[in-house]
UniProtKB/Swiss-Prot annotation:
Organism field: Photobacterium profundum (strain SS9)
Entry GO terms, CC: cytoplasm
Biological role stated in the UniProt entry: Modulates RecA activity.
Protein name: Regulatory protein RecX
Compartment(s) of residence: Cytoplasm
Phylogenetic placement of the source organism: Bacteria, Pseudomonadati, Pseudomonadota, Gammaproteobacteria, Vibrionales
GO BP of this protein: regulation of DNA repair
InterPro entries: RecX_HTH_2nd, RecX_HTH_3rd, Regulatory_RecX, WH-like_DNA-bd_sf
Family designation: Belongs to the RecX family.
Keyword Transcription regulation part of the UniProt annotation: no
Pfam families to which the protein is assigned, alphabetical: RecX_HTH2, RecX_HTH3
Keywords for this protein: Cytoplasm
Length: 262
């Protein structure tokens, strides 16, 4: 009997018998941390299903200054503005049920030093891993002003940042990809043309062609273990190499010398 009683007992706080108990319950939660009006109402529905009591308690707390969406929004923003940009903060506050006017007022309390710290944190996180373009897009998605982004970027990132990222990309893909594919990959990752030109400035054109021809041949030999005898097979082989980032001339060289030294 006892076990059956335990399993059916309603979880949550003891239901309020009078409005004063709802008020005390609300004050207890506000002493734990700040709440928006909307979220505190949700808490109070656990104590009572009487909407008039809830409305009365909320009104009393607002009149006493214990409850304020404006103050909640300001505190929320100040505690998180070095972690999130305005767009994300706005989304989070809307989920708390805070209105647009209070959100806009709270966002106005963010100063430039807070924003600069957020930008610097994102730069440090992605330095050498993401291009300047991608970092800029990431910050813009947070709702940070482009002028502020560029100001901090110019003092925190130099060409060495892109060179490190480009070198990582090259080292990862160079053995399996031709020069045209590498260039396309670098550009798609937001690496500037100046950085690309600098990295490849000391290579001779003939050496590049020869190296890419041999890489294309190596990839083809791994993929196709038997001779390519008809046009359809050669067409598929060419498409395979082009997808790998090799040019048509490099693909033709590989097909011509396929399995030659094996």
């Amino acid at each position: 009997m006892f076990s059956e009683y335990k399993s059916t007992k309603k979880a949550g706080p003891k239901p309020a018998q009078k409005v004063e108990q709802v008020y005390e319950y609300a004050v207890w939660w506000l002493n734990q941390r700040g709440y928006s009006v909307s979220k505190l109402k949700e808490k109070l529905t656990r104590k009572t299903d009487n909407p008039e009591w809830i409305a009365s308690v909320i009104e009393k707390l607002l009149d006493q200054g214990y409850l304020s969406d404006q103050r909640f929004a300001e505190t929320f923003v100040q505690s998180r503005c070095r972690l999130y940009g305005p767009k994300v903060l706005t989304q989070k506050l809307k989920l708390q049920g805070v209105g647009t006017t209070d959100i806009e007022h709270a966002l106005c309390t963010i100063n430039d030093s807070d924003t600069d710290e957020l930008i610097s944190r994102v730069i440090a996180k992605y330095s050498g891993k993401k291009s300047i373009r991608d970092i800029t897009m990431r910050l813009k998605s947070e709702g940070i002003d482009d002028t502020r982004i560029q100001s901090v970027l110019s003092s925190n990132i130099d060409t060495e940042h892109e060179s490190q990222l480009a070198t990582r990309i090259i080292n990862k893909h160079a053995k399996k990809m031709g020069r045209s594919g590498l260039l396309q990959k670098l550009r798609s990752e937001g690496i500037s043309q100046d950085t690309i030109d600098e990295l490849f400035s000391e290579e001779s054109k003939d050496d590049v062609i020869e190296d890419d021809q041999h890489k294309a041949l190596e990839q083809l030999n791994k993929k196709y273990k038997t001779s390519l005898t008809d046009f359809a097979e050669k067409k598929k082989a060419t498409a395979f190499l082009v997808r790998k980032g090799f040019s048509f001339s490099e693909a033709n060289y590989a097909i011509e010398h396929h399995l030659e030294d094996l």
